[in-house]
Structure formats: structure tokens, C-alpha cells
Swiss-Prot record:
Residues annotated to bind Zn(2+) 1: 70, 72, 85, 88
Subunit-structure text: The RNAP catalytic core consists of 2 alpha, 1 beta, 1 beta' and 1 omega subunit. When a sigma factor is associated with the core the holoenzyme is formed, which can initiate transcription.
Protein keywords: DNA-directed RNA polymerase, Magnesium, Metal-binding, Nucleotidyltransferase, Transcription, Transferase, Zinc
Ranges for region Disordered: 1384-1407
Gene giving rise to this polypeptide: rpoC
Function: DNA-dependent RNA polymerase catalyzes the transcription of DNA into RNA using the four ribonucleoside triphosphates as substrates.
Protein name from the UniProt record: DNA-directed RNA polymerase subunit beta'
Length: 1407
């Protein structure tokens, strides 16, 4: 019996494997796969349609065409299983063996495998140490190669032309062997003794001096090492036997009309077989050499085309002029095996239809058309019909269903109750694009969708379609209900804020009912409770917007957790009091006693989730929605053209602007301003004007004059329909209303530059023909941009997912002490993101102490910061917190829960097995479509208008200096003499409120820790000149000042004062080229003074174009300006914005002119310049010097004698992330990447949590570069996975040997994806050929650790609920007990770790 059951399993290969290994196939292995040799190119007999014997479809080789039936029909049925027919040679078995039985072709002459020859770097070339060009000349019969020199002066692997060969034959007769073609290469490869070659190279690498040779040797050592370790032989890269793919994988299908559709592979195989057979015949006939050679070359070319068509020479085309699809093309690209069939499969039990709005559904429901449900749940319905006895057979049940009998519908109702379905809207950019709902049967053919989940799906009802899938197994249903149900996805995983927020109509309704208006019916009435008020409202005694007093009863929770009722009389409006009726118990009335704009509603739902948990919030969100719709209907808001009020001031503002433009035009004509300045100023004037008119318009629309209850005339917010919509956040924005009622403003040309004549009209007035034409320009560009943007954004998401796909939470605590220090983010003096927002949901890395009290920790190490904790931190005035980060996590694979912190979508500590990598990739990729594509062009004045020349405080408090070096001027002010100094303002609690950068040479009007008032000016400076400040008091002495050569004297006509300007280098002529004009400060006797704290003389090198106003010998005091350098309006640097910028950062691309950072700390001096470069020298503390050559056109921002620290900017520009990592380390790099990426997203108003960017940065830092190999087997300069080096070093240290030293390397996301340990994942991403070639040579083993690899081999992913399956599978093979397994999977927490976290409604995931 057991064998009978085994019958079905014989064909199934085992699924229980732990790894997949790839390698080179030896000829013996290929022959062992084969079931016979394919000798003829024929496919099938066109009369009988039966396969030809020994042909490409031969039944004797590949198996029978029909199950259990031989080709000639002698043996049929199961009883002859396994018999080989003596007449036709077919084995009687299942026909599906034709999918797995391979054949082979014995090649008459060896052939090189094109992947190992042409895929760069050429493996055959490296192995033989010959160039690819030379090998190709041998292979394609253009030259001889010496395979065995014997005793002749010839070298092995030396190439000989035909003449040289004949000459050598004459000279040396048969003393040497030389041949051509793949045989020659095969011989050379066969002779290589890998071990001795390896030893020779290891010796050579020690003595070699040349850089290029070293690189070549390193590559060869790696390759030979790979061959030795994997057990591959070099000659296997040359094929002597060619495997033939099973016929069912390259089918030949008869079409009607007697023609055949065939796979391209059959054509390619036919070509190879034809040429091979012809070559055999020629060799038998011992034909002339030239003919044989030609045939061999053609055979090589046809095998090349079969393996990878088009890689060498022109691609072989079929009858229809398109290139044939070779074996390589089958697996690579979007249509290849990996991406088309293994990573994206089509599934059954699915349907799709248009979606319509379902405003009366509950949040967990969706409306499913009856017809669709019946089709989807058919098998369930059949089973139930049979169980009920309404049908006896499946056939009978089928008939009932087809006739759509009445009882079928009742049964369908029962079947679908409590059976969730999964809805999906393409494009699925993040995990909220697929959610589970309980179906409700509806009439019609459209799917009803709950309005609150539209944001998550990014769906609207203008014809969008959605797909429905049915989870069949019990496990799938359970997961759909527990994890994917729409009620479990209230918070966005990107930022932890509610994603189930009302929008549009609902917001409008709630806003309308919560507005307060003056002098409405019933104003000033007092009500005992809300039900009394409701009665009054229903009887039209009070109006909805009247201001009234109501007694509200609330439930309050005190410190002990006891719940008490508290009632109070509140000033409110009728609408808000009615709104309080749906407020769940435990939420304060304050939350709704305000205008319910979209922001406030979001805050309300967030508070509800944090205070009351999931279930209450879901019910509340539904009630909010129903209320919103009801009152939107009552409001009856509509817009008409009269709602667009054009401000009266428009005419006069336009007049002023036109006047200004005329003035500038005149200045330009008289030559006072350049064309560029004129353009910039004009654009500036118009954008300012536009803003003024827009403000006037918003004031006009947004306020109205009314008489209040006391008879006075007052202004109140108007109820203008347009204004209501924009103000509530329901639809539209001030920008759009501006175009309707103020002026359209400036338009953009397709290249992104601004047209200087604005559109003065608005849409209500109507545009003139010319204005309309101008506006079409930019509009078309916008549409083209959108299309490109979607593609680019999708590609970015794909790369991000690929680099992070194997990152999961693998343990609770890795025990690291490292982390990142978080501080508030400040821009232009304002705090953009306070500290509490940055550390919320993070785990503290070390105790946080009270500022000014080092004994008392507020928060202890390893605490998860929730809302209560961050409030405490803010109260205490903490300015920086060190938190755990994925970047510093020390888990070998994946990250640990404490380094990751809170799961943003659930609000508690992240669960074991959560796929945090994919979530990070989706959170960053999904808003990609909202980012802009264009680079911003910023002209001169657009910037110079905003040239800041002082610091004015916005809040009162005390001043704190950070990193600030300053000297005290004689008049009592301080002068800044450092570049990276900052001034901050702290409030009474010591919390930082503002922070400003101070430029060099700024005058500071306050002392450190001084009290300041709001509006006070702390510091000021000249924005147009960069001063050089003297740090000592003494007398000026000019050095190398030669009039007319290095300096030009200028006298001002008005004042008569003279000043000297340092001449440009080009103008100095030959005698001035070695002069270095500088100002030295000396004492009375003329001795050099030194800068305090150093032994450098106080001298200041003057760069070209700097201006000196002092005379030689004049006295200077501390803090006086010695010279100043005019700053031209900063060069227009295009700011790359939007998507391209994000992509550049993640790809870790070096900017075009990167900032030059100081390689070490020390004091600056300048050396002798070369032709196009200036020489900058940094002298460090122990006197060693480091030189840096800097192009003349770059502006150096440091001066002689200035002290710089390692990694400080010395030449302005965009810093390169690689430099930051090398000079400053991982933490500053992380801070830089997070800041730069967040800046782009913040500009678009997109919120993404920092930890997602950190997760991706972690993956970019996976590799390290070996700087000193120690006793390890790594080579210097090799890039290796960090974890491999750590493991290897641990072994070395255990044996008391020298460990390898290494530096972290930053790889871009594409590079990092391709450099992953898993070759299956890398091959399915990009450059499939290269990845597989490399992996085969190394004999790589893929341990199937990531998500992609497991999807490809058809298993559950090792994340989420699939992690338990994997751990059980692993340990069942080891045979552990239950308790041991629990310990391993990570139930236990590491010692000394406490995790404090409120886990409300937590759904524990496997683990």
C-alpha cells in the first residue's frame, strides 16, 4: 500500500533542502544527465506529426508523447510501466518526463563557452593571463598559440601568425606544439596546475611594485582560489559536450493551417547539430585544413548564439528579422524566467472590476457583486450544496449554480460570512495597497470600497479598477484576518501617523458643523446636557453655528488609573456639542471643541488610537465618516463664479510692479545692471507681486463684516464656499485659489527656466491669447514629467527593495552600546523637527541625564520612548539623546528589535521576523511619485534678495555658543574667527528654541549665557564681503606688495580714500608669478608676532581680488578687519531636487565638484602653486605635513594660520558621502544621508521616519575593504562582507594570529544589491549573465536567507509568520526538543535588558 501512495511522489523532488549550489558542469556530468545523444537536426515528421528518431524531439531519448504509451503503440496502459519498446526504443512512462530528461550533442571539436570568454572580466583570459583579443584570435582561427614550447626559444601562450608559424616549423621542425581554435585553448587550460600557479602568484604579489600589475595579480589569485575551493577545473570552461534542453521546455506547437509555432531554441539547436554533423563528415574525409577550420569557426559561432545570442558579433535573426531568443535571454530581463515566472505569478480565484464608493459600509467590509462572489467561491458553494443534500454530485451542484437557483444565493451568503477576501489596487507601492475585507453581497457589477481606505490604496472613483483574491487555506484566512484586515492597518508604516483619515466630503461636513458664527439664532443659550441641546436644534430653536454653553460630562483617568466622571460647562457651538456625542469615552471634549480641519481630525484619530487602542478607534472613525457625510449633505456647499472674489487692490499692486520693472529696464539700458541681473530682478518683482495679490485675495475671500449680538460690526471668517474648502483641507489650496481669483503668475519654460512676463489675469477674468499660449508651455512639460517620474520612481523602489529584501528582525537584543545621537533639526534658525519627534519610538542607547545634574537619569538605557517618555524629555529640556539605530546594530544577519525600536504601523516594539527592510524600501519609494523631477535653477537675485546679514532672536531666553572661536574687539563686541560656530537661544527650561550658524568675521553683540529679548539683534555681518580678521594687536607690514604687479591702487572719487586690490594671477606677468602678497602683523620694533596659542607668525595671505584699506605701518587692534574679499553673488548652482537627488544619494554617487575636506587636523599654510592648481598644506600637531592640490577655479574658504579639524570643509561644494565616511566615520555619514534625503521629502510635505533611511544606509555599508590582511586569507584592497571578516577574525584571534584590519565602504544601492551573498537574488535583479558567471566559477552556495531567494524556490518567506516555519524546518533536521527550539527562536530576552512598551492590541507574530 505504501508503495502505491509513493507512486505519486516519485516525480516530486524533495523540497527539503537548505542551500543551492551552482558550478561548472564537467563533460562527465553533462553525459550523466543525458538520456541519449541527439544526432539529427530533424524535429517531427510533418506527415505523421511524430518525433523523428535521434532528432531534437526523439521519444527514445526524451520519453513518450502520451502517458504510458510507446510511440509505435505496441505497449499501452499502466501494466507495461518501465518497459522499453524494442521496436521504437521508447520507455513506457509518464509524458511529463519530457520536461526533465535532457539529451546531449557530442561536439566534434571543443567550443569555448561564451559567458566565460566574453562576460567581463573574461575568466578564460584571466586564467591564462592572456588578453581577450588574443584568445579570440586563437578561437576564431586567426592565429596559432604555442601550447608546448619544448626546447625551442618560443614561449608558452605566445601567439604566432600563419607566416611566423610556418617559419618556426621550418626552424624547429616538430620540437614544439602550436595549434589554433578551441582545442588549443582547451590544452592550455588543461595544463594549468592550480596549486603551483597559486603559490607562484602569492610569491610574485609580495615583490611586485607596479600598481597595475598588483591589480591584475590580485584578480588572478582570486580567480584561481575560486577554482580550487569550488573544485571546478579550468578546462570545463570549454565545452566538449553540449547539453540539450528537454523538449517540453522548447515546445513545437502545430497551428491550424498546417504551420508550426516553435521556440527559437529549436532553430539554434538545429544550427549547431547541422554544423557539428558537417564537421564530423569533413574530419572523416580528412578535408583540407582551411575548410575544416571554417567549419569549426562556424560551429563555435552557432554554439555562441545558442548560449547567448548577440553577445559576440551580430545576433542571428529568424525569418521575421528579429534576433532569436537564446538560453541567456530566457532567464534575463523583465520577460525572463526570474522576473516573469518566479517572482511574479498569476493566481486563480481572482477577479477584477471597477470600484464605487460604499459610504454605508463598516471599515472592515467591502461590497462584492453577487455574480463575482458566486464565481470566486464556487468550490465552497458546491461542497455546501452537496453537504445539504441539495445536489448529489458535483455535476448536479454545477447545474444548480449555473441556473442561479434561489437556494444557491442563501448558501453563498453562508459561505462568505467570516471569510475575508483580499483587495488590491495596482500599482501596489506599499503594503497598504493590499488589504483584507469581509465581503458583503451587493447587486450590480462594481466592487464597493470603504471611503476611508482610499488614501491607503491611493484610489478614487473615476474608473479605477481593483482586483479581488480569495485566501483559500485556513492559515491564509487567519493571516488575512489577523494581519491584513483594513482595521489593523490604521497607522502608516512610513511615519506612524493615521492613514485612515477622512478626506474631501467628510472633512467638509465636519468642518462645516464645527464652525462658529456671530449672531446666529439661539446665541448665548445654556443647556444642561447634549440631549437637551439636540432637542432644541431639531426644533429649530438654535442654529448649527450658534455659540452656546453646554454642560459636558467626561470620563477622566487619574494617576492611579481610576476612572472618574467630571462635568463642566463649556463655551462651544451647537455643531461641536453634537459632535461630542460620537466621541468615545475617555477622549477629552477639547479635541473636538475647535474647527475640525483635516489636520485636527488626523490629530483626533491619532489621540484616539494612542489613548483607547485599536477597536475603539475603528468604530469612532466609522462614526466620524457617517456624521461627516450627513452634515456635508446638510451644508449643501457648492461653488459658482461669484465665489471667486477678485481683490480691489489688484490694479494698484500691478501698477506698482510695472513701474518697478520699467525702472530696472532703464537701468539695464544705461548699463547699470547686467542682463542676468535684470532678468533675476524682474522675476523677483513679479513673484513678490504675485504673493501680495494672493494675500489680498485670501483676505478678501476669507473674511466678512457682520453685526454681532451686541450690535457692533466685527470681522469674522467667511463662509465663502471656496474658502471653506481650502481652509478645511477638503480640496484645493491657496495656490489654486490664487490662480482662480488673484493672478496666475509666472510660468515655466519646458527647460525649467522662468518666463519673465507673468500672466496677470486669473481664470475668472480669463486669459488673453498670448497668456494662454505662455501657460501651455509649462503645462505640457508637466504632463511629460509625470510620465517619466512614474517610471523613475518605480525603478528607485525596485532597487531599494532589492537591496533591503533580506533584512528582518532576527533577535530581541544584539547587546551593542552604539547608537546615533539625535538633536533637533534646525533650518534658518527655526526648529523644523523637534527632538521629541525624532526619538519617538526609538530605544535609548545610554541613560539620559537631567541637564546640569549628572546623577539623576530621566530615562534608563534600553527603554522604548513612547509619547509619555518624550513629553518627560521635553519638559526636562534635554537637547540630545543617544538612541539605538539599525546602522549600529551588531546582529550578524538582519537587525535586532531594540536597535529598530517601535513598529510604526502597530505602535509597539517591533515583532520578531518583521521584514523591516522591505517596509523601509516601500516607505521611501512610495512617495517617490510625489517628488519633482526637475532641478531648480536659482538666479542671482533670487538668492541675494535673501542675503541675511544679521541674527534676530524670535524668542526670549539665554544665549549659548557652540564650537565658537572668537576674539574680543577693543569696543567690547566679540568677533567670530571660526567657521563652524553656532549660536543658540535657550528658554527658561534650558530647551533649545533657535539655532543659527555664524559666519567668519561676524560681530557678536552679546556674551555667552547672556539673557536676550525677542527681536534683539545678536550678531551682524557684511553679506557681500568676507573679512580677514586680525587675532593680535600690532602694526601692519605689507609683504610682496608691488604696485601695478601684485596690487592695483584705487582711489574713490567721492571720498578720496585709497584702497589696494590684489591683482589676479593672470594679470601679474612673469616677474609677479612667484610673489605672494600678504599682510604681517609686527610689534613696535618690527618683530613678527605669533597667533596666540600657536607658534605661527601672525600673517594673512591675501587671495586675488581682496581689498586692503589699511596703509603700511598702520596700527591694528584685536578683531580689526585687515582685508576683505568681495563675495560675488554666489555662482548659480543648480540645486538638484526631487527624485534625481534621492537617487544620487542612495547610489552614493560622487558630486561633480565635491567639497574638499581636511584629511587631518592641523594648521593651514600655502605652498608653491603649480600651473593650474594651488598647493594647500595642513601641518598637524606632530609636525608632519599633508599636501592637497586644489584647482585654481575652486574657492578655498580657509586662510593661512587657521586651525582645521579632520573632515572640516576647506573648499566649498557638495560633500561626497565617501569622504564623510572615510574622514568622519559612520555616524556623521548617517546624519548626512538622513538630513539630505529628508530635506527633499520635507520640501514636498512628505513625512518619513528616519529609521527607514537608516535601514537602507545599513545595507549600503554591508561591505568592508581590507587594508591589512594579517594572517587571514583575504587580499589587501579586497571588498568583503563585513560579517565574513568578523567571523574570520574571531577564528584568527582564537588561534592567536593577526586579524585582518578593514575600513567600511559605502556602496550605492545597485552595487550593494549585486554584491549580496545570494546569487539567486542578485541574478534576478540585474546583469543576470555576469552574476551567474561569477557564481558558477566560484561554486557559490546560496543559503536561501533572503525573501527573494525563497520566493524563487517556492517556499514561505523567512519573515513574519513564515519565520516559524523556517526555524521548525531547520531544527527538525537537527532534532531539538521543543524547549531548546523556543530558546533558539528568540523567546528569551538577553540578560539585563528591559523593554518598556505599552503593547495595546499587539498581535504577536511568530517567533
Amino acid at each position: 500500500m505504501k508503495d502505491l501512495l509513493n507512486l505519486f511522489n516519485q516525480q516530486r523532488q524533495t523540497l527539503d533542502f537548505d542551500a543551492i549550489k551552482i558550478g561548472l558542469a564537467s563533460p562527465a556530468l553533462i553525459r550523466s544527465w543525458s538520456f541519449g545523444e541527439v544526432k539529427k537536426p530533424e524535429t517531427i515528421n510533418y506527415r505523421t506529426f511524430k518525433p523523428e528518431r535521434d532528432g531534437l524531439f526523439c521519444a527514445a531519448i526524451f520519453g513518450p508523447i502520451k502517458d504510458y504509451e510507446c510511440l509505435c503503440g505496441k505497449y499501452k496502459r499502466m501494466k507495461h510501466r518501465g518497459v522499453v519498446c524494442e521496436k521504437c526504443g521508447t520507455e513506457v512512462t509518464l509524458a511529463k518526463v519530457r520536461r526533465e530528461r535532457m539529451g546531449c550533442i557530442e561536439l566534434a571539436s571543443p567550443v569555448a563557452h561564451i559567458w566565460f570568454l566574453k562576460s567581463l572580466p573574461s575568466r578564460i583570459g584571466l586564467m591564462l593571463d592572456m588578453t581577450l583579443r588574443d584568445i579570440e584570435r586563437v578561437l576564431y582561427f586567426e592565429a596559432y598559440v604555442v601550447t608546448e614550447p619544448g626546447l625551442t626559444p618560443l614561449e608558452r601562450r605566445q601567439l604566432l601568425t600563419e607566416e611566423q608559424y610556418l617559419q618556426a616549423r621550418q626552424e624547429h621542425a616538430d620540437d614544439f606544439d602550436a595549434s589554433m581554435g578551441a582545442e588549443a585553448v582547451y590544452e592550455l587550460l588543461r595544463m594549468i596546475d592550480l596549486q603551483s600557479e597559486m603559490a607562484r602568484l602569492r610569491e610574485e604579489i609580495v615583490v611586485t611594485g607596479s600598481e597595475t600589475k598588483l591589480k591584475r595579480l590580485t584578480k588572478r589569485i582570486k580567480l584561481i582560489e575560486a577554482f580550487i575551493e569550488s573544485g571546478n577545473r579550468p578546462e570545463w570552461m570549454i565545452l566538449t559536450v553540449l547539453p540539450v534542453l528537454p523538449p517540453d521546455l522548447r515546445p513545437l506547437v502545430p497551428l491550424d493551417g498546417g504551420r508550426f509555432a516553435t521556440s527559437d531554441l529549436n532553430d539554434l539547436y538545429r544550427r549547431v547539430i547541422n554544423r557539428n554533423n558537417r564537421l564530423c563528415r569533413l574530419l572523416e574525409l580528412s578535408a583540407p585544413d582551411i575548410i575544416v577550420r571554417n567549419e569549426k569557426r562556424m560551429l563555435q559561432e552557432s554554439v555562441d548564439a545558442l548560449l547567448d545570442n548577440g553577445r559576440r558579433g551580430r545576433a542571428i535573426t529568424g525569418t521575421n528579422k528579429r534576433p532569436l531568443k537564446s538560453l541567456a535571454d530566457m532567464i534575463k530581463g523583465k520577460q525572463g524566467r526570474f522576473r516573469q515566472n518566479l517572482l511574479g505569478k498569476r493566481v486563480d480565484y481572482s477577479a477584477r472590476s471597477v470600484i464605487i464608493v460604499g459610504p454605508n459600509l463598516r471599515l472592515h467590509q467591502c461590497g462584492l457583486p453577487k455574480k463575482m462572489a458566486l464565481e470566486l467561491f464556487k468550490p465552497f458553494v458546491f461542497a455546501k450544496l452537496q453537504r445539504r443534500g441539495l445536489a448529489t454530485t458535483i455535476k448536479g451542484a454545477k447545474k444548480l449554480v449555473e441556473r442561479e437557483e434561489a437556494e444557491v444565493w442563501d448558501i453563498l451568503e453562508e459561505v462568505i460570512s467570516e471569510h475575508p477576501v483580499v483587495l488590491n489596487r495596482a500599482p501596489t507601492l506599499h503594503r497598504q495597497g493590499i488589504q483584507a475585507f469581509e465581503p458583503v453581497l451587493i447587486e450590480g457589477k462594481a466592487i464597493q470600497l470603504h471611503p476611508l481606505v482610499c488614501t491607503a490604496f491611493n484610489a478614487d472613483f473615476d474608473g479605477d479598477q481593483m482586483a479581488v483574491h480569495v485566501p483559500l487555506s485556513l492559515e491564509a484566512q487567519l493571516e488575512a484576518r489577523a494581519l491584513m484586515m483594513s482595521t489593523n492597518n490604521i497607522l502608516s508604516p512610513a511615519n506612524g501617523e493615521p492613514i485612515i483619515v477622512p478626506s474631501q466630503d467628510v472633512v467638509l461636513g465636519l468642518y462645516y458643523m464645527s464652525r462658529a458664527l456671530e449672531n446666529k439664532k439661539g446665541e448665548g443659550m445654556v443647556f444642561a446636557n447634549t440631549s437637551e441641546l439636540k432637542r432644541a436644534y431639531d426644533n429649530s430653536v438654535v442654529e448649527l453655528h450658534a455659540k452656546v454653553k453646554v454642560r459636558i460630562t467626561e470620563i477622566e483617568t487619574d494617576d492611579q488609573g481610576l476612572r472618574n466622571k467630571a462635568s463642566s460647562i463649556v463655551d462651544t457651538t451647537v455643531g461641536r456639542a453634537l459632535l461630542s456625542e460620537i466621541l468615545p469615552e475617555g477622549l477629552p471634549f477639547v479635541l473636538v471643541n475647535t474647527e475640525m480641519t483635516k489636520k485636527n481630525i488626523s490629530r483626533l484619530i491619532n489621540s484616539s488610537y494612542r489613548m483607547l487602542g485599536l477597536k475603539e478607534t475603528v468604530v469612532f472613525a466609522d462614526k466620524l465618516m457617517y456624521t461627516g457625510y450627513a452634515y456635508a449633505t446638510r451644508a449643501g456647499v457648492s461653488i459658482c463664479i461669484d465665489d471667486m472674489l477678485i481683490p480691489i487692490e489688484k490694479k494698484e499692486i500691478l501698477g506698482e510692479a510695472e513701474q518697478e520693472v520699467l525702472e530696472i529696464q532703464e537701468q539695464y539700458q544705461s548699463g547699470l545692471v547686467t542682463a542676468g541681473e535684470r532678468y533675476n530682478k524682474v522675476v523677483d518683482i513679479w513673484s513678490r507681486t504675485n504673493e501680495r495679490i494672493a494675500k489680498a485675495m485670501m483676505d478678501t475671500i476669507g473674511t466678512e463684516r457682520v453685526v454681532n449680538a451686541d450690535g457692533e460690526i466685527v470681522d469674522q471668517k467667511s463662509m465663502n464656499s471656496l474658502y471653506i474648502m481650502a481652509d478645511s483641507g477638503a480640496r484645493g489650496s491657496p495656490q489654486q485659489i490664487r490662480q482662480l481669483a488673484a493672478m496666475r503668475g509666472l510660468m515655466v519654460r519646458p527647460d525649467g527656466s522662468i518666463i519673465e512676463t507673468p500672466i496677470k489675469a486669473n481664470f475668472r477674468e480669463g486669459l488673453s491669447v498670448q497668456e494662454y499660449f505662455n501657460s501651455t508651455h509649462g503645462a505640457r512639460k508637466g504632463l511629460a514629467d509625470t510620465a517619466l517620474k512614474t517610471a523613475n520612481s518605480g525603478y528607485l523602489t525596485r532597487r531599494l527593495v532589492d537591496v533591503t529584501q533580506d533584512l528582518c528582525v532576527v533577535q530581541l537584543d544584539c547587546g551593542t552600546a552604539g547608537g546615533l545621537t539625535m538633536t533637533p533639526i534646525v533650518e534658518g534658525g527655526d526648529v523644523v523637527e523637534p527632538l521629541k519627534d525624532r526619538v519617538l519610538g526609538r530605544v535609548v542607547a545610554e541613560d539620559v541625564l537631567l541637564p546640569g545634574n549628572d546623577d539623576e537619569p530621566i530615562v534608563t538605557r534600553s527603554t522604548l520612548l513612547d509619547e509619555q517618555w518624550v513629553a518627560k524629555l521635553e519638559e526636562a529640556g534635554v537637547q540630545s539623546v543617544k538612541v539605538r539605530s539599525p546602522i549600529t546594530c551588531e546582529s550578524p544577519f538582519g537587525v535586532c528589535a531594540l536597535c529598530y525600536g517601535r513598529d510604526l504601523a502597530r505602535g509597539h516594539l517591533v515583532n520578531m521576523g518583521e521584514a523591516v527592510g522591505v517596509i523601509a524600501a516601500q516607505s521611501i519609494g512610495e512617495p517617490g511619485t510625489q517628488l519633482t523631477m526637475r532641478t531648480f535653477h536659482i538666479g542671482g537675485t533670487a538668492l541675494s534678495a535673501a542675503a541675511i546679514d544679521n541674527i534676530t532672536v524670535k524668542t526670549s531666553g539665554s544665549v549659548k555658543f557652540t564650537n565658537l572661536k572668537y576674539v574680543e574687539h577693543a569696543n567690547g563686541t566679540l568677533v567670530a574667527v571660526s567657521r563652524s560656530g553656532e549660536i543658540s537661544v535657550l528658554d527658561t527650561h534650558g530647551r533649545e528654541r533657535e539655532r543659527y550658524k555664524l559666519p567668519y568675521g561676524a560681530t557678536i553683540n552679546v556674551k555667552d549665557m547672556a539673557e536676550v529679548k525677542s527681536g534683539q539683534i545678536l550678531a551682524n555681518w557684511d553679506p557681500h564681503n568676507h573679512p580677514i580678521v586680525s587675532e593680535v594687536a600690532g602694526f601692519v607690514r605689507f609683504i610682496d606688495f608691488v604696485d601695478g604687479v601684485t596690487v592695483i591702487e584705487k582711489t574713490d572719487d567721492l571720498t578720496g580714500l585709497s584702497s589696494r586690490e590684489i591683482a589676479d594671477l593672470k594679470r601679474r606677468g612673469s616677474q609677479g608669478k612667484d610673489l605672494r602678497p600678504l599682510v604681517r602683523i609686527v610689534d613696535k620694533k618690527g618683530n613678527d608676532l605669533t597667533i596666540p596659542g600657536t607658534d605661527l607668525s601672525a600673517q594673512y595671505l591675501l587671495p586675488p581680488r581682496s581689498i586692503v584699506n589699511l596703509q603700511d605701518g598702520a596700527p591694528v587692534g584685536i578683531g580689526d578687519v585687515v582685508a576683505k574679499i568681495p563675495q560675488e553673488a554666489s555662482k548659480t548652482r543648480d540645486i538638484t531636487g526631487g527624485l534625481p537627488r534621492v537617487a544620487d544619494l542612495f547610489e552614493a554617487r560622487r558630486p561633480k565638484d565635491p567639497a574638499i575636506l581636511a584629511e587631518r587636523s592641523g594648521v593651514i599654510s600655502f605652498g608653491k602653486d603649480t600651473k593650474g592648481k594651488q598647493r594647500l598644506i595642513i601641518k598637524d600637531a606632530d609636525g608632519s605635513e599633508h599636501e592637497e592640490l586644489i584647482p585654481k577655479y575652486r574657492q578655498i574658504i580657509v586662510f593661512e594660520g587657521e586651525h582645521v579639524t579632520k573632515g572640516e570643509t576647506i573648499v566649498d561644494g557638495e560633500p561626497s558621502p565617501q569622504d564623510i565616511l572615510r574622514l568622519l566615520g559612520i555616524e556623521p555619514l548617517a546624519a548626512y544621508l538622513v538630513k539630505e534625503i529628508q530635506d527633499v521629502y520635507r520640501l514636498q510635505g512628505v513625512k518619513i521616519n528616519d529609521k527607514h533611511i537608516e535601514v537602507i544606509t545599513r545595507q549600503m555599508l554591508r561591505k568592508v575593504e581590507i587594508v591589512d590582511q594579517g594572517n587571514s586569507k583575504f587580499l589587501n584592497g579586497e571588498q568583503v562582507e563585513r560579517q565574513r571578516v568578523i567571523d574570520e577574525n574571531a577564528k584568527l584571534i582564537a588561534r592567536n594570529e593577526l586579524p585582518a584590519k578593514y575600513n567600511p565602504v559605502l556602496l550605492g544601492i545597485t552595487k550593494a544589491s549585486l554584491a549580496t551573498e545570494s546569487f539567486i537574488s542578485a541574478a534576478s535583479f540585474q546583469e543576470t549573465t555576469r552574476v551567474l558567471t561569477e557564481a558558477a566559477v566560484r561554486g557559490t552556495r546560496d543559503n536561501l536567507r533572503g525573501l527573494k531567494e525563497n520566493v524563487i524556490v517556492g517556499r514561505l518567506i523567512p519573515a513574519g509568520t513564515g519565520q516559524t516555519y523556517h526555524s521548525q524546518r531547520r531544527y527538525s533536521s537537527v532534532g531539538l526538543t521543543e524547549s531548546e527550539m523556543e530558546t533558539l527562536v528568540g523567546r528569551s530576552t538577553s540578560s539585563g535588558t528591559e523593554v518598556t512598551s505599552p503593547s495595546k492590541d499587539a498581535i504577536p507574530l511568530g517567533g
